[in-house]
């Protein structure tokens, strides 16, 4: 649950203006020279009869435009109360899902109750007249392998869930009560104010939220964009009471007035046939009230002349150096078929030769750039460019602004050009035609929201990303709006002068006018010969041939094509999705890269510099729906490549050759070193719960180091050290490769040969292949405590992670811990977050490290960490009786939920490939571990689980590691009088992590589950049954 940073329903932008500006993924943006045949059904929106009227609801006769391999069936209906629903039958779905989008959001908050829409979203989870228990909905989903969430945006509120497919109706039954008969119980209302307040406090030191709110605050007060929308205890508790307002009454009024059926769009995905889904929709949602409320419009301009031609100087929490320039532009939302913002985003956000970013990097002024269009409300649209500056770039920020206008000037002189549109169109066609299925909950959530765009025919709702109209005049109109008079700049750095503080987050800032000389240069920037349009893309695919064989059963694991002293080659021809795609994973086992913290940091710099040098290749590939990356791992280095298979191996070859011939440059070394130092420093200012994994890994794993330790080393690295280190990287190399997809095995063998030809020496080290990371074993019956104060002295939240180390990893123990995590998941959240209101972030899970099995609970809270530890221990103690009293039927439901989740079929080729990659990386080659684990879970008895609880969780022999990240802010308002300070915190304090680790044994690495023999790939035929 939460407030979304989305300020509009724009399909092009996923972050707020002036925070994380969007240059859309090049998959959907870029272009190709060769043309596809046009889709024959693009113009078929309705059949002759637009709809059929049954006795209960209206069914529209639509011819949906779908990706080629989409086997789902779709139906669009309207209930008598005007609620509209898109129903999706997926006969193969393991998870069903549903989402309801209300076309009302935070813009409708009353002036005297900021955050009410968000608060209403929270309260709808707390029970309905039909299901009054406040955790009934979440409990039902948990028992049946489900999950849920919601968000409140400016003009819409979106609720969604997914659940094992057999239990869709029960979940829908509970879900529908949100909208027809919510309770808004007083007790729940009072408690949930604390949850909203905790959510707000979680974001108080988050620069994205701080700068977003500052941007809003410095706009026209007559437009609701100006408002604070999250809410807190002051706006929803203290002030309403002082003003004689009953917040529960206001919630009821808000829900009655705005949660009107005619403003709701529902999307349901399940295995059931469309008639059944239609009947369920009618039965469960027909009672949602319709008061005929119209979708509100917000006609006031967000930016008036007094808000433009300004520089907003912002002092961030983190060490950021950014320049963001935004323009008011024509609203192009309804021109979704030609998408002028997308074309401009592609051009200004390009990273290849001749681009704005390439030139800024050459000057040493920038590291990253993004650009994107953004509609906040009808008639209020923006286009923005966001640049991550270097120190030198910050000094030359005015020159950077002029360069932006020089690039815009070049575009005004060069556009429109039909070939750019053609290439973008062809890439969007290919991406749509071969679109892979995503998660059910994200699918329905996105579609429910998109249905609010009533200017898009419902039959095209699946194909909104396509470019189908060439409208050069609109592109010219859009580009012509990028002028100084329509712009304002946000400059972000700790070094800037400020004179004001924003009301809600306290962000320090100062607003100054554009200097006269800057305006002059912005208006007459001239042309810069270094700035040009991107070249035609050599990586665009034109051959999408797939030799599909019907009626075969997919293999469960790849075959081992080759194994010798230097490498293993795993291969699997796609036999499941029949997509023209491929996935390549190349893992170099390189002991020298992690022999010390210095070597580890030098390896990080090496990969960063190599990626930087090969950015031109990477970016052109990304524009053509191919991806390639080069990263450091805790075993060495890894290259991953994916995308349309026609040119995937060509890309890999080019990239490998580039890495092989790469020679670092000192100027880029200094810039990337500085960028990494800033990144490491900023990690120490992240929200506490996101820092926890780094501290935990640094304590429990071999050759792992804390952020502070990495920072200390990184600051002292020299260019000479890197130059001397690079020749040693590939000594004793061993590598493993996975090639998966629409790729021939002969091509896979060629990849192995190519890599071997590039290896600089033939020193064989047979131990390298087993040099995997291992975790330390805690002594039995011992509890250890690690404490550290947060670097951010203003963050009010602390965080605790309570880890029980069960034992050395085994399949049996993994099954037991997995089921235990399933059993405690909902009660833990309900107890510690909902009932005790400890904090917004409460999380529990099983945790399998490098050789050990564990259970953890994590809480981020304003409470002290000793208090949180007490409440965690209390939860564990009381859960024993809950487990013993649990009806056998409920216990079996939890087993079924976990087994169904483990046995989910792959949704797409990327998911399948990731499963194989993980097994290769872990070294156990247990490609079917989820199936094996499901069998083990199915055989666990309730008594075995009670024994597990008593012997592992509550036993005196339990081994525990408890991490305390402590806020420096003392909260005197919290009541912790019941805490036994003589007892908590528990455990032996770890004062020196290195000394502590030196006393411990390490766990064994996972061993191969079976012997694999080298074999040729099996010939695919249709003699076996399909999956």
Curated annotation (Swiss-Prot):
It is an enzyme of class 3 (hydrolase). Inhibited by chelating agents like EDTA, TPEN and 1,1-phenanthroline, as well as NEM, free cysteine and DTT. Its cofactor is Zn(2+). Binds 1 zinc ion per subunit. One of its GO terms (biological process) is peptide catabolic process. Its EC number is 3.4.24.-. Induction: Expressed in both haploid and diploid yeast cells. Disulfide bonds: none annotated. It is a peripheral membrane protein. It is found in: Membrane. The keyword Zinc applies. Zn(2+) binds at residues 118, 122, 199. InterPro entries: Metalloenz_LuxS/M16, Pept_M16_N, Pept_M16_Zn_BS, Peptidase_M16, Peptidase_M16_C, Peptidase_M16_M, PqqF-like_C_4. GO terms for molecular function: metal ion binding; metalloendopeptidase activity. The active site is at 121 (proton acceptor). Its main location: membrane. Pfam families: Peptidase_M16 (PF00675), Peptidase_M16_C (PF05193), Peptidase_M16_M (PF16187), PqqF-like_C_4 (PF22456). Optimum pH is 8.1. SUPFAM superfamilies: LuxS/MPP-like metallohydrolase (SSF63411). Belongs to the peptidase M16 family. Involved in the N-terminal endoproteolytic cleavage of the P2 precursor of the a-factor mating pheromone. Capable of proteolysing the established mammalian insulin-degrading enzymes (IDEs) substrates amyloid-beta peptide and insulin B-chain. This is A-factor-processing enzyme. The lineage of its organism: Eukaryota, Fungi, Dikarya, Ascomycota, Saccharomycotina. The gene is STE23.
């Amino acid at each position: 649950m939460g407030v979304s940073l989305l300020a509009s329903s724009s399909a092009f932008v996923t972050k707020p203006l002036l925070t994380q500006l969007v240059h859309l993924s090049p998959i959907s943006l870029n272009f190709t020279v060769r043309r596809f045949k046009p889709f024959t059904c693009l113009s078929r929106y309705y059949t002759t009869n637009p709809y059929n009227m049954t006795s209960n609801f209206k069914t529209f006769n639509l011819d949906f435009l779908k990706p080629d391999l989409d086997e789902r069936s779709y139906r669009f209906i309207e209930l008598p109360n005007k609620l509209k629903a898109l129903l999706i039958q997926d006969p193969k779905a393991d998870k069903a899902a549903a989402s309801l989008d209300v076309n009302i959001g935070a813009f409708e908050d009353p002036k005297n109750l900021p955050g009410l829409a968000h608060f209403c979203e929270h309260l709808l989870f707390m029970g309905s007249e039909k299901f009054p228990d406040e955790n009934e909905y979440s409990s039902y989903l948990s028992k049946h392998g489900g999950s849920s969430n919601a968000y409140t945006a400016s003009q819409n509120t979106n609720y969604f869930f997914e659940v094992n497919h057999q239990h869709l109706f029960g979940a829908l039954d509970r879900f529908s009560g949100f909208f027809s008969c919510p309770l808004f119980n007083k007790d729940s209302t009072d408690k949930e104010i604390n949850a909203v307040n905790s959510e707000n406090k979680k974001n108080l030191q988050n620069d994205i939220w701080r700068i977003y709110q500052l941007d809003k605050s410095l706009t026209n007060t007559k437009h609701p964009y100006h408002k604070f929308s999250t809410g807190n205890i002051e706006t929803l508790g203290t002030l309403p009471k002082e003003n004689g307002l009953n917040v529960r009454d206001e919630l009821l009024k808000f829900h009655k007035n705005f949660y009107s059926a005619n403003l709701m769009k529902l999307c349901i995905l399940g295995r059931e046939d469309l008639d059944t889904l239609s009947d369920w929709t009618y039965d469960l949602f027909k009672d949602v009230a319709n008061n005929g409320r119209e979708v509100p419009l917000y006609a006031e301009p967000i930016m008036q002349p007094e808000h433009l031609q300004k520089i907003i100087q912002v002092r961030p929490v983190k060490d950021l150096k950014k320049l963001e320039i935004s323009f008011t532009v024509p609203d192009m939302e309804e021109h979704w078929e030609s998408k002028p913002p997308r074309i401009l985003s592609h051009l200004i956000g390009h990273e290849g030769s001749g681009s704005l970013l390439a030139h800024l990097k050459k000057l040493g002024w920038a590291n990253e750039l993004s650009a994107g269009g953004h509609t906040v409300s009808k008639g209020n649209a923006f286009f923005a460019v966001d640049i991550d500056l270097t120190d030198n770039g910050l000094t030359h920020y005015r020159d950077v602004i002029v360069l932006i206008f020089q690039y815009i000037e070049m575009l005004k002189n060069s556009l429109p050009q039909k070939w750019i549109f053609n290439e973008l169109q062809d890439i969007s066609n290919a991406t749509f035609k071969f679109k892979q299925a995503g998660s059910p909950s994200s699918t329905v959530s996105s579609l429910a929201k998109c249905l609010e765009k009533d200017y898009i025919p419902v039959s095209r709702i699946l194909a909104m990303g396509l470019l189908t109209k060439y409208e050069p005049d609109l592109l010219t109109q859009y580009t012509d709006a990028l002028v100084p008079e329509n712009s304002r700049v946000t400059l972000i750095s700790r070094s800037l002068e400020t004179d004001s503080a924003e009301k809600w987050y306290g962000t320090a800032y100062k607003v100054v006018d554009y200097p006269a000389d800057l305006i002059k240069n912005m208006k007459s920037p001239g042309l810069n010969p270094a700035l040009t349009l991107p070249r035609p893309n050599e990586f665009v695919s034109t051959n999408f041939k797939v030799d599909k064989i019907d009626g075969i059963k997919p293999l469960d694991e790849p075959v081992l094509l080759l194994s010798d002293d230097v490498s293993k080659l795993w291969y699997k021809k796609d036999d499941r999705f029949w997509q023209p795609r491929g996935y390549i994973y190349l893992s170099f086992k390189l002991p020298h890269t992690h022999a010390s913290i210095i070597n580890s940091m030098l390896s990080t710099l090496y990969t960063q510099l190599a990626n930087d040098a090969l950015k031109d290749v990477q970016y052109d590939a990304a524009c053509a729906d191919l991806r390639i990356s080069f990263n450091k791992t805790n075993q060495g280095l890894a290259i991953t490549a994916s995308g349309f298979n026609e040119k995937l191996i060509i890309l890999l070859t080019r990239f490998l050759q580039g890495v092989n011939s790469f020679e670092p440059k000192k100027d880029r070394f200094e810039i990337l070193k500085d960028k990494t130092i800033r990144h490491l420093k900023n990690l120490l200012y992240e929200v506490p719960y996101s820092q926890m994994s780094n501290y935990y890994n640094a304590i429990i794993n071999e050759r792992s180091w804390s952020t502070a330790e990495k920072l200390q080393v990184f600051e002292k690295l020299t260019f000479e050290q890197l130059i001397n280190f690079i020749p040693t990287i590939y000594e004793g190399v061993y590598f493993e490769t996975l090639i998966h997809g629409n790729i021939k095995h002969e091509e896979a063998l060629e990849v192995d040969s190519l890599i071997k030809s590039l290896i600089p020496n033939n020193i064989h080290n047979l131990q390298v292949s087993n040099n995997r990371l291992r975790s330390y074993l805690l002594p039995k019956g011992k509890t250890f405590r690690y404490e550290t104060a947060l670097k951010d002295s203003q963050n009010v939240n602390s965080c605790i992670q309570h880890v029980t180390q069960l034992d050395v990893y085994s399949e049996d123990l993994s099954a037991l811990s997995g089921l235990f995590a399933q059993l405690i998941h909902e009660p833990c959240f309900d107890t510690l977050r909902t009932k005790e209101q400890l904090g917004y972030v409460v999380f529990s899970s099983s945790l399998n490290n490098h050789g050990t099995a564990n259970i953890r609970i994590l809480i981020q809270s304003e409470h002290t960490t000793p208090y949180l530890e007490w409440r965690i221990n209390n939860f564990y103690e009381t859960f024993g009786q809950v487990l013993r009293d649990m009806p056998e039927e409920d216990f079996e439901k939890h087993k079924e939920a976990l087994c169904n989740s483990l046995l989910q079929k792959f949704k797409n080729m990327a998911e399948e490939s990731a499963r194989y990659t993980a097994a290769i990386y872990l070294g156990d080659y247990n490609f079917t571990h989820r199936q094996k684990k499901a069998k083990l879970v199915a055989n666990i008895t309730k008594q075995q689980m009670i024994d597990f609880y008593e012997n592992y969780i509550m036993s005196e022999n339990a081994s525990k590691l408890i991490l305390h990240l402590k806020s420096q802010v003392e909260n005197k308002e919290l009541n912790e009088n019941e805490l036994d300070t003589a007892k908590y915190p528990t455990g032996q304090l770890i004062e020196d992590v290195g000394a502590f680790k030196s006393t411990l044994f390490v766990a064994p690495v996972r061993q191969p589950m079976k012997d694999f023999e080298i074999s040729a790939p099996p010939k695919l035929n249709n003699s076996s049954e399909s999956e």
